[in-house]
Amino acid sequence: MSVLSILNYPNKKLRKIASNISLIDSEIKSLIKNMLETMYFNEGIGLAATQVDVHKRIIVIDISKNKNKPLILINPVFINKCGAQTFEEGCLSIPKKTAFVNRSKKVKIKAINCLGEEFLLKSKGLLATCIQHEMDHLIGKLFIDYIKPLKN
């Protein structure tokens, strides 16, 4: 496994739209392992393939205290969103910057795991926020896009 280079804002590649994965082969599995290593090395809780300059719909997340419960989401799609919550967010592609972002409190998604099996996932709280943040990366959106400009 290896630590991958993370694209930093304002790199225009962060705005690219990711494409679906049609086959989960050894190359994709290797990418996922490297993404996890990169996320853990950089002390993040989520990473989208877009952030490592691979424009595929892959997300890795681990919000566990001991960093031992990785969640892999391939081709994730929102099924439902409800409620509202605000979390202070940061991003490995925008180092040392944070902002409070309003997002849905609960989300339900459909995704594929590393074995190619489709599954549904309901989440709330921090996990729901993390999923929404990382899924934004797949459509070229960053958390700073939610920040309203200051008024004079």
Swiss-Prot record:
Report the Gene3D superfamilies cross-referenced here: Peptide deformylase
Physiological role: Removes the formyl group from the N-terminal Met of newly synthesized proteins. Requires at least a dipeptide for an efficient rate of reaction. N-terminal L-methionine is a prerequisite for activity but the enzyme has broad specificity at other positions.
The record, for CDD domains, names: Pep_deformylase
| UniProt-recorded name of the protein | Peptide deformylase
Which Pfam families does the annotation name?
Pep_deformylase (PF01327)
Instruction: Tell me which species this is from.
Output: Wigglesworthia glossinidia brevipalpis
One of the record's GO molecular function terms:
peptide deformylase activity
Q: Where does Fe cation bind?
A: 91, 133, 137
Question: What does the record say about how the cofactor binds?
Answer: Binds 1 Fe(2+) ion.
Spell out the catalytic residues.
134
Q: What are the protein's UniProt keywords?
A: Hydrolase, Iron, Metal-binding, Protein biosynthesis
- Which prosthetic group or cofactor does it need? Fe(2+)
Q: What is its EC number?
A: 3.5.1.88
UniProt lists the family membership as follows:
Belongs to the polypeptide deformylase family.
Q: Which domain of life is it from?
A: Bacteria
Substrates-to-products reaction catalysed: N-terminal N-formyl-L-methionyl-[peptide] + H2O = N-terminal L-methionyl-[peptide] + formate
GO terms for biological process, alphabetical: co-translational protein modification; translation
